[in-house]
């Protein structure tokens, strides 16, 4: 299983726009083949810091997910939303 943790730092004035863009992606991604879970969390310690935690069956499922039009749209909008660069960690879940 492959795990992705993506941390997003969002400008205060872009918070509502970010959430409007990411919310439909959550449902869409969860319906994709190979998606075990796909959730967005907001930090309790830092306003407008969000962490997307994704669990995928394998790299092929991630590659297919990366073609999701809603994800592509979010990628295009992130420079406008971001207060600073996102941090993305991809890991393989061991036995």
Where do the model's predicted regions map?
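Absolute protein N-terminus
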Residues: 1-2, 95
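Short, well-ordered beta-strand segments in beta-rich or mixed alpha/beta enzyme
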Residues: 2-8, 39-66
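Residues at secondary-structure transition points
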Residues: 13-16, 47, 65-69, 73
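Short amphipathic alpha-helical segments
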Residues: 14-35
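Short, flexible helix/strand-to-coil boundary loops that buttress conserved ligand/catalytic motifs
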Residues: 22, 66, 75-78
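Glycine-rich beta-strand-turn "strand-cap" elements at beta-sheet edges
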Residues: 40-48, 76-95
């Amino acid at each position: 299983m492959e795990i992705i943790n993506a941390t997003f730092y969002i400008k205060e004035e872009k918070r509502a726009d970010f959430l409007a863009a990411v919310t439909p992606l959550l449902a869409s991604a969860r319906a994709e083949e190979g998606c075990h879970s796909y959730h967005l969390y907001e930090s309790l310690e830092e306003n407008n810091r969000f962490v997307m935690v994704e669990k995928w069956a394998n790299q092929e499922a991630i590659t297919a997910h990366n073609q999701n039009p809603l994800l592509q749209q979010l990628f295009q909008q992130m420079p406008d939303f971001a207060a600073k660069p996102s941090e993305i960690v991809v890991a393989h879940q061991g036995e």
